[in-house]
UniProtKB/Swiss-Prot annotation:
The keyword Signal applies. Heterodimer with IL12A; disulfide-linked. The heterodimer is known as interleukin IL-12. Heterodimer with IL23A; disulfide-linked. The heterodimer is known as interleukin IL-23. Also secreted as a monomer. Interacts with NBR1; this interaction promotes IL-12 secretion. SUPFAM superfamilies: Fibronectin type III (SSF49265), Immunoglobulin (SSF48726). Residues 238-329 form the Fibronectin type-III domain. CDD domains: FN3 (cd00063). It comes from the Eukaryota. Its main location: secreted. The lineage of its organism: Eukaryota, Metazoa, Chordata, Craniata, Vertebrata. GO terms for molecular function: cytokine activity; cytokine receptor activity; interleukin-12 alpha subunit binding; interleukin-12 receptor binding. Disulfide bonds join 50-90. Keywords: Cytokine, Disulfide bond, Glycoprotein, Immunoglobulin domain, Secreted, Signal. This is Interleukin-12 subunit beta.
Length: 329
């Protein structure tokens, strides 16, 4: 949130907020007005200033009304509800001089609204953003869910502490083809790829990465934040190249696998541990899992069963990979 008066030079559009400083610039010509949301709330007074050195012949209109709202270089409006938000335009002699788009950020009982994204409910605290990294390269993926289909826009920014010179760059949020069902309702999934510019995979992390998602739906603005260390969001790809070797005169087989290609190297330093599980024919019959650091194991595998292997960082209890499997047949 802005902590000083927002004053642009005479050739640009200027918005001045009330002393509560409840207005700030999201992007060029787009401003967020922060409102306490309760019955009979007074709202916020906003002053719009046109981008012309002239003082006469200026009129104001809004997208909500074609009527002239006022005249002169400035227009003062009281913003109390969504009907007061949207586009405001100043004109002179039929010429458009500048635009301003006002969005509202609601606060009810001291809590900012979180209506746009779906709470993924994976902890005691609300979880709107989830992030994963396949290795320690500094590259990670974040995603979120929403039931909204239209008039929706996201922007993402990230950093690793204000005092850390290493920047984090995020691409544009994209709509995934995957649809996620939660409580019998289908949600759309958005993802974003981020990369820490000067990541050092072997270095100890002292500052968390912070990610902020700005979400806009129609005239509503919300933001969502998450903070984490890369080590906490590590989830390797599944082991690759699973192979079975029958053992002579035995019902046992030797199953072997390799580290996933995307895992950090050298493997002698970035080591994985593995979990092995044998499934029966109906896939519901499962024997106890075996845990080991080697890339092979001897197990009993019956016809029509399968062997599953997954991986996790050996030295830090982050997430297990998805399973890789091979048929016993």
């Amino acid at each position: 949130m802005c902590h000083q008066w927002l004053v642009l030079s005479w050739f640009s559009l200027v918005l001045l907020a009330s002393p509560l400083m409840a207005i700030w610039e999201l992007e060029k010509d787009v401003y967020v007005v922060e409102l306490d949301w309760y019955p009979d709330a007074p709202g916020e007074m906003v002053v719009l200033t046109c981008n012309t050195p002239e003082e006469e012949g200026i009129t104001w209109t809004s997208a909500q009304s074609n009527e002239v709202l006022g005249s002169g270089k400035t227009l003062t409006i009281q913003v109390k509800e969504f009907g007061d938000a949207g586009w405001y335009t100043c004109h002179k002699g039929g010429e458009v001089l500048s635009h301003s788009h006002l969005l509202l950020h609601k606060k009810e009982d001291g809590i900012w609204s979180t209506d746009i994204l779906k709470d993924q409910k994976e902890s005691k605290n609300k979880t709107f953003l989830k992030c994963e990294a396949k290795n320690y390269s500094g590259r990670f993926t974040c995603w979120w869910l929403t039931a909204i289909s239209t008039d929706l826009k996201f922007s993402v920014k990230s950093s690793r502490g204000s005092s850390d010179p290493r920047g984090v760059t995020c691409g544009a949020a994209t709509l995934s083809a995957e649809r996620v069902s939660v409580d019998d309702r289908e949600y759309k999934k958005y993802t974003v790829e981020c990369q820490e510019g000067s990541a050092c995979p072997a270095a100890e992390e002292s500052l968390p990465i912070e990610i902020v998602v700005d979400a806009v739906h129609k005239l509503k603005y919300e933001n969502y934040t998450s903070g984490f260390f890369i080590r906490d969001i590590i989830k390797p790809d599944p082991p690759k190249n699973l192979q079975l070797k029958p053992l002579k005169n035995s019902r046992q087989v030797e199953v072997s696998w390799e580290y996933p290609e995307t895992w950090s190297t050298p493997h002698s330093y970035f080591s994985l541990t593995f979990s092995i599980q044998v499934q029966g024919k109906n896939k519901k019959e499962r024997k106890d899992r075996l845990f080991m650091d080697e890339t092979s194991a001897t197990v009993t595998c019956h016809k029509d069963g399968q062997i599953r292997v997954q991986a996790r960082d050996r030295y830090y209890s982050s997430s297990w990979s998805e399973w890789a499997s091979v048929s016993c047949s």
